[in-house]
């Protein structure tokens, strides 16, 4: 469904990579484009074409009301009063993913979830590539979706956030999944159900819905085209035979888990979801197997950062919410003590789910950052520090062979770092001093 934007007054809210991709797309379609960014010095302003008007520091209500169409950044809530005023005036408000879906002609595999979505997106793209198809991977990971339209692709694999899905209506995915749902972005949503409903939009018009059999929140009433993944009682499941675990597609053995470079139960679940998505999109099993063997995983996601003196230092800085840390801790094999680094900005989440997992005699918690106090209250074996560096300096002398130091903070990083990547890099730097 291609739409004409010629001479339409379109206001793009939010610059950065995604905003610029919207501007470039709309200019190529001969739209009359204006840009608003609530920041006084927005990233990407210097790359904006000089003939495009830019308003910074606030939402320009007059510009919004003069628009035929508003393209909203996923970072800005639709509930914002100025946006509600525009909607009440009958002005359409959509996001960059909706623009993309109206234009894309090739099959789309769509992935969302509170945790694991970047890993699954990258793994599925690897599977599509292994089948000899030209894959366009983007959305909430790497390249903005609209930028993918600049080159020819056979298939698109998109990671989508709840924020992006809120303003997407025309997505008709070949296969789609909500990997899991746990509290995240509670500072943006009324409650968990509000957040869940945003995620479930990914299933609307999908040919195949891939559902987590272990997470009832990922299921949607009335779905007739679903397949499931989970440890057991699912279409895609784990089979254990003679001490080895195997990834299964219904009755067919896909691969032994120990043949993958990905480790940990949560990654076996990610692999099962990826197999289901790829098979539903027609990717041959042999290509899927090859991709599973080759895939190295992603940085800052349960990544071995350093190994010295028998101690493993594991960087899981991408664990920016409780569910992600729960996934890292579930089924974790330990020989010695786990030194767990927790803390940062909890985004209003309820941390209580962690309590039963971390209240173990072989787990010591080192809590830091904005919500460190709240996290330290979960376990009597917790210590409180201002920064991650202070915590690491305190735990370093206590380490013994067989121990693991795990950064899986259950929080966003922005209280003390520019990004989860910077936090992970700093952890790795400190680990290598050992």
Swiss-Prot record:
Top-level division of the source organism's lineage: Bacteria
Keywords assigned by UniProt, alphabetized: ATP-binding, Cell cycle, Cell division, Cell shape, Cell wall biogenesis/degradation, Cytoplasm, Ligase, Nucleotide-binding, Peptidoglycan synthesis
HAMAP family given in the database record: MurD (MF_00639)
Name this protein carries in UniProt: UDP-N-acetylmuramoylalanine--D-glutamate ligase
Enzyme class: ligase
Catalytic activity line of the entry: UDP-N-acetyl-alpha-D-muramoyl-L-alanine + D-glutamate + ATP = UDP-N-acetyl-alpha-D-muramoyl-L-alanyl-D-glutamate + ADP + phosphate + H(+)
Gene designation per UniProt: murD
Any GO MF annotation of the entry: UDP-N-acetylmuramoylalanine-D-glutamate ligase activity
Enzyme Commission number(s) from the entry: 6.3.2.9
Pathway stated in the Swiss-Prot or TrEMBL entry: Cell wall biogenesis; peptidoglycan biosynthesis
Gene Ontology annotations of biological process type: cell division; cell wall organization; peptidoglycan biosynthetic process; regulation of cell shape
Claim: Coiled coil is one of the keywords in the record: no
Function: Cell wall formation. Catalyzes the addition of glutamate to the nucleotide precursor UDP-N-acetylmuramoyl-L-alanine (UMA).
Residue sites binding ATP per the record: 113-119
Major site of localization recorded for this protein: cytoplasm
InterPro entries with a match to the protein in the record: Mur-like_cat_sf (IPR036565), Mur_ligase_C (IPR004101), Mur_ligase_C_dom_sf (IPR036615), Mur_ligase_cen (IPR013221), MurD (IPR005762)
Entry similarity comment: Belongs to the MurCDEF family.
Subcellular location, record wording: Cytoplasm
GO cellular component: cytoplasm
């Amino acid at each position: 469904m291609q739409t004409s934007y010629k001479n339409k007054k379109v206001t793009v809210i939010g610059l950065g990579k995604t905003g610029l991709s919207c501007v470039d797309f709309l200019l190529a379609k001969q739209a009359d484009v204006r840009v608003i960014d609530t920041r006084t010095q927005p990233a990407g302003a210097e790359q904006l074409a000089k003939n495009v008007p830019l308003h910074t520091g606030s939402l320009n209500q007059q510009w919004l009301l003069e628009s035929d169409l508003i393209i909203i950044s996923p970072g800005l809530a639709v509930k914002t009063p100025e946006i509600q005023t525009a909607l009440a005036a009958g002005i359409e408000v959509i996001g960059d993913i909706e623009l993309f879906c109206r234009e894309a002609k090739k099959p789309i595999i769509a992935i969302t979830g509170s945790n694991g979505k970047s890993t699954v997106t990258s793994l599925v793209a690897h599977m599509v590539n292994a089948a000899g198809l030209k894959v366009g991977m983007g959305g909430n990971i790497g390249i903005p979706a609209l930028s993918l339209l600049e080159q020819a692709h056979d298939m698109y694999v998109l990671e989508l956030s709840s924020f992006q899905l809120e303003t997407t209506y025309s997505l008709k995915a070949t296969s789609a999944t909500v990997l899991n749902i746990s509290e995240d972005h509670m500072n943006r949503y009324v409650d968990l159900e509000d957040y869940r409903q945003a995620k479930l939009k990914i299933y609307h018009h999908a040919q195949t819905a891939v559902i987590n059999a272990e997470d009832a929140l990922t299921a949607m009433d009335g779905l007739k085209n679903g397949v499931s993944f989970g440890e057991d009682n699912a279409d895609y499941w784990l089979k254990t035979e003679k001490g080895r675990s195997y990834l299964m597609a219904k009755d067919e053995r896909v691969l032994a888990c120990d043949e993958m470079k990905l480790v940990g139960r949560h990654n076996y679940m990610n692999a099962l979801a990826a197999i289901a998505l790829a098979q539903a999109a027609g990717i041959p099993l042999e290509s899927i197997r090859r991709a599973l063997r080759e895939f190295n995983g992603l940085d800052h996601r349960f990544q071995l950062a350093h190994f010295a003196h028998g101690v493993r230092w594991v960087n899981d800085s991408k664990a920016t919410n409780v569910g992600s840390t729960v996934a890292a801790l579930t089924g974790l094999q330990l020989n010695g003590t786990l030194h767990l680094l927790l803390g940062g900005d909890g985004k209003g989440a309820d941390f209580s789910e962690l309590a039963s997992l971390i209240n173990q005699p072989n787990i010591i918690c080192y809590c830091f950052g904005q919500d460190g106090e709240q996290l330290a209250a979960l376990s009597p074996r917790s210590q409180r520090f201002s920064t991650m560096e202070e915590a690491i300096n305190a735990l370093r002398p206590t380490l013994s062979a067989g121990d693991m130091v795990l950064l899986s903070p259950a929080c966003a990083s922005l209280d003390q770092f520019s990004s989860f990547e910077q936090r992970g890099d700093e952890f790795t730097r400190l680990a290598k001093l050992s």
